[in-house]
Amino acid sequence: DYLQEAHPEKELPELFPDENITGRDMEEDSFSQYYSSDAPRKRESKKPAFQLKGEKLRQEDMSITEVCIPVKEIHARAKAAGVSITVFLTAALIWAIHEEVPQNQAKKPIGLMIPVNLRNYFPSQSMANFFGWIEISCYFQPDTAFEDILRSVKEQFAKELSKDVIEAKLNDLVSLEKNPILRLVPLEIKTPFLLAGTTLGGRSITAIYSNVGIIRMPEEYRKYIQRFGLFASTDSLQLCSCSFGDEMVLSFSSKIPNGNIERNFVEKLKKEQVSCEIRENDFPGQKEERKAPAKLFESFTFLCIVLAVVCNLIDYLVDGHMGWAWFVTAGAFCTWLMVSVAYVKRRNLLKNEMWQ
């Protein structure tokens, strides 16, 4: 623990003092523990949702925006609307996305994936992943008001968060893993189909919103902590939120760095009498020079081009025609193609060599 190392004289308490929890408890597969082959499953078709468009950043890059709001203000506004904070922020995000929907796609719904902590439904001490999700989808009409979206989101939350629905989804998910036929298929064959299934399943999702909720720390730690924030990697747009004390941090991560949805979201909160402050939009290292692998790849590309040009020039000046230089050019191109595929797929040349 960093704070324990930084302040050894304070003798800060352990954050996980429960000695009754064993290593086996923390490593258990809670999905398999609560899976029942006889339980009902929940499968339903989802209509394709609006998808965010725009030029995306490179694989290793991410646009980051962090917004801080007072817990008291957002709680008061959500309470006045008769909804929870999570429902209110979900509706606000859907509203912000809708403002960017072009007219020719206005009939498509806005779909959000909301991760759900399954520990709230099934007791578990596991440190492994034990999360499910629900999908919230809203259609807009020309006269749709924000209150209509709030009402729709609230109703969907109440339906999707019932234990029966959550349990059915858990069984549906684990049943694929337990399928004896699929378990016999080699991973190399399954991978393309899994990727295709992920793509098809993601058609009903526009963005993701994950609310971690209230973070509580022992009193001895509180004076050393100003706030908490979290981000998640995404292929499109994801909003994460958490609160500590009287401050809630809303963290946007996006592959499409135009910032319009983030702007719309902040403006909507301000219209709802919730003050917002963008604390950080330029994190340390965000404008630093490119990482070494990117520089190395660019230098390698340049050298391949130089090699091909120089060899062709020498061949032409010496022999008066193109001969052996074509073989050098072809070899340089094949080498560049192999390295470029490795770089694009894994962004780590040494790791790719290990895989090969």
Regions found by a protein language model. Give the residues of each.
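Non-catalytic, low-complexity flexible loops and terminal extensions
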Residues: 2-73, 269-287
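Gly/Ser/Thr-rich phosphate-binding loops and adjoining beta-strand/alpha-helix segments
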Residues: 51-119, 248
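Acyl-thioester-dependent acyl-group transfer interface
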Residues: 99-289
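Hydrophobic, membrane-inserted alpha-helices
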Residues: 306-312
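Juxtamembrane "helix-exit" motif on the non-cytosolic side of transmembrane helices
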Residues: 312-319
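Hydrophobic alpha-helical transmembrane segments
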Residues: 320-332
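Membrane-helix interfacial anchor on the cytosolic side
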Residues: 334-353
